[in-house]
Structure formats: structure tokens, C-alpha cells
């Protein structure tokens, strides 16, 4: 969610965890009456309304949100524990005590999501791409928040010279979204694919 500096407005995307299947477009606003009246007037002029199918799918997804988030969190925790033992990988995930965000995360949040970053030490980018491409249970993409596990190599999201994270020499970023599959299957899949890293 995005909160304004005055903390009177909250904007939430409903395209991700809310529906749980990466198949809707939507968002929600929690605003004061003054802002609400402006938004309502703009909505009438532009015709931007949530479609009935999207509204139905989001409502249906909300019924299982807590159960799904528990599973995402537990699966991600197990995978984070497995990956943190690998010397080639620096885990970007607030659950780990050595994470630079751990204290803030602990103060403000009761759990983590299924999204994590891996800073991978490798001599060449090709082996990192091979690692991602050889994952059998992970789809490729960045529609985080759905039921399925996804993997994305950093460079496929760079635009021009802009980089989303500062990486050291021989470091490559892979982002993982951990889905609802059996965590032991996901760990086995990651383990077999890690053999491609050089």
C-alpha cells in the first residue's frame, strides 16, 4: 500500500495477493470525504470503474487471503533458510536477522511476503540466466502475489543504464516470488538448478 505524507490517503493495488491468481486489474482508495468527492467526480467524467468480473474475483480472493499469505510466508521462510546457507548467495529478505531491514521489519510487520531477492556471485551472467531457465517449478515473470512461484533475472527489468539495485562486480540479481507449491519441491528444484552457477 501507498500512504500519503499526511497519512489520510491509502492506495492499494488489488492485482496481486488480493485476488491470488494474477488475473485482475484493480485498486482501492481509503480517503477522507473531501478527496472522495473529487475522486467520485473524476470517476464519473472518465468512466474508470472496476469491472464486475474483477470485483467478483477480488472478493472471492479475499475469502482465502489469510490462508494463502500464511502459506506464502511459511514457504518463503523455508526457502530463505535453505538459500542463506549458500555462500554464493546474499539473500535480500527481511526475515533474516542479518538483513539491513530486519529491525524495521520486526517493528512494523507481523510477517513477510513471498518475494525475495538473491544477489548471486557468479563469474558470468550466462550461468545465472541458466540457473533461472533451468528452474522447473518456477514460471518466468514478475506478477508477484499469485499462487505460482516465479523467477526473474535482474537484467530483464533494466531500462537503459538504470539499475534497480547496486550490485558489486560479479554480482547478479535474481528475484523470486515463492508461491503455494510444496516447499520441499521448490527447494529440490532450486537445488538442482544451482548446479548451473559458476
Which residues does each predicted region cover?
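PLP-dependent enzyme catalytic core of the Aspartate aminotransferase-like
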Residues: 122-126, 149-198
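Small/polar loops that bind or transfer phosphate-bearing groups
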Residues: 2, 31, 178
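Short, solvent-exposed coil/turn segments
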Residues: 4, 24, 111, 169-171
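Hydrophobic aliphatic residue packing
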Residues: 10-11, 24, 178
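Structural preference for beta-strand elements that scaffold enzyme active sites
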Residues: 9, 90, 115, 173-175
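Active-site C-terminal subdomain of aminotransferase-like
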Residues: 14-115, 119-156
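Single conserved hydrophobic/aromatic residue that forms the stacking wall/gate
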Residues: 1-7, 11
Amino acid at each position: 500500500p501507498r500512504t500519503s505524507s499526511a497519512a489520510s490517503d491509502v492506495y492499494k493495488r488489488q492485482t496481486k495477493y488480493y485476488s491470488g491468481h494474477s488475473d485482475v486489474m484493480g485498486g482501492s482508495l481509503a480517503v477522507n470525504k473531501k478527496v472522495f468527492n473529487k475522486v467520485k467526480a473524476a470517476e464519473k467524467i472518465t468512466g474508470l470503474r472496476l469491472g464486475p468480473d474483477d470485483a467478483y474475483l477480488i472478493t472471492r480472493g479475499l475469502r482465502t487471503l489469510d490462508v494463502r499469505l500464511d502459506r506464502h510466508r511459511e514457504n518463503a521462510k523455508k526457502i530463505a533458510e535453505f538459500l542463506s546457507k549458500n555462500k554464493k548467495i546474499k539473500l535480500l529478505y527481511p526475515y533474516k536477522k542479518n538483513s539491513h531491514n530486519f529491525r524495521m521489519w520486526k517493528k512494523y510487520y507481523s510477517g513477510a511476503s513471498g518475494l525475495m531477492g538473491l544477489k548471486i556471485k557468479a563469474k558470468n551472467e550466462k550461468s545465472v540466466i541458466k540457473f533461472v531457465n533451468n528452474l522447473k517449478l518456477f514460471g518466468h515473470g514478475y506478477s508477484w502475489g499469485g499462487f505460482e512461484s516465479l523467477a526473474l533475472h535482474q537484467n530483464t527489468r533494466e531500462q537503459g543504464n538504470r539499475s534497480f539495485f547496486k550490485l558489486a562486480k560479479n554480482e547478479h540479481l535474481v528475484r523470486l516470488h515463492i508461491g503455494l507449491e510444496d516447499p520441499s519441491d521448490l527447494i529440490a528444484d532450486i537445488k538442482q538448478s544451482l548446479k548451473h552457477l559458476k
